[in-house]
Each structure stands twice: as C-alpha cells, then as structure tokens.
Amino acid sequence: DADSAYAQSMRSAETLAVCYAEKFGMNVKIARPCPTLGGVRMSDERKWAKLIVSAAKNQSIMLTDNGGEKFSFCYVTDTVSALIDILLNGKSGEAYNISNDNANVTMREFAQLVKSANPEKNLSVVFVHRKDEEEPEFSPSSPTPYVLCNDKIKSLGFSPKTTLKDGIKRSIRAT
C-alpha cells in the first residue's frame, strides 16, 4: 500500500532526524503539515487538488467514490505562520501537526465547498465510475489518519486566519 509506505518512510525520517540531533547536539523540530491549499499545478494527482483544478478550468467537479474520506486542510499563509511558530517557539525533538480545526472535512464536503465558493461558475459535483447513474450511497467514514490533531502547535500560539472556503476560492484563482 503506497499510503502506508509513505507514512512509514516519514516516521523513519523523523526518527533518524531526532536521533542524529541528540547524538550531535543539534536542534531539530519536525513539522507535519496537512494538505496545504494554495496554487495547484494542473498536473497534480491528489484527490483534493483535482477538484481545485476542475473548478479553475470551469469543469464539473468529479468524485470517483462516495467522498467519505476525511482530511484536514490549511491555507498556505497559515501553514507558513505555523512553520515560523515551530522554528521560533517549538521544542527540539518534538513533532507538530499543522492543520486548521475548522477545515476537517470529507471529500464530498470539500467538493461541495469548491462548488459553493464559485457560484458564478455554475459548477456541478458529479460521481463517476459507477455502473449505474445514481449517486453513490454516502456514509462519512470514521476519522482517519488524514485528520490531524493540532493541539501541540496551538500551544505555541498558532491560530489559522483563513477559512476553508476562502482558502478554496484563493486556490482556484491561483491555479
């Protein structure tokens, strides 16, 4: 599973960094940003990025499943602010999740926000790769590792300023 391999490689890299820092007396702080909204490359293959690109191209917003996966998001300026908080106030050897408590949504909710953020575009949310034409049954999945707890970064004074809807609008404009 590619997602599992990615997660394991990140944990390994964090462990190596902390061990190296302890051995050589270095100051290491770890940032774990959630998906960061901002300008998106047209070739970006991440699920949420494809929705932004579709809206930027005035195309239907397509979901290839029921949209139940839940993610944390943060706008780029808030992510940069969190990184500065970590650099200036974070504790060496600690890892900090960067996310916005008000931006934990399912992909279905994210798609609807992309649509509602641009009412002038008359975008529609479409479910594809179905044998029938009906919308797939929806049941939000339980919280997954894609939703990050940001209590530790908030203890450093981090407070996101950009709403998810504004972050989506800005991302579409910048794409």
Model-assigned labels for residue ranges:
Residues D1-I30, P35, S43:
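Catalytic helix-loop patch of NAD(P)-dependent Rossmann-fold dehydrogenases
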Residues S12, L16, Y20, L51, ...:
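Hydrophobic alpha-helix immediately C-terminal to the catalytic Tyr-X-X-X-Lys motif of short-chain
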Residues K29, T36-G38, T79, A103:
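Conserved sequence/active-site signature of Rossmann-fold short-chain dehydrogenase/reductase
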Residues G39-V40, L156:
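Residues that scaffold the ATP/ADP-binding catalytic core of kinase and kinase-like folds
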Residues D44, W48-A49:
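Amphipathic alpha-helical segments in well-structured domains
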Residues A55-T175:
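C-terminal substrate-binding subdomain of Rossmann-fold SDR/epimerase-dehydratase oxidoreductases
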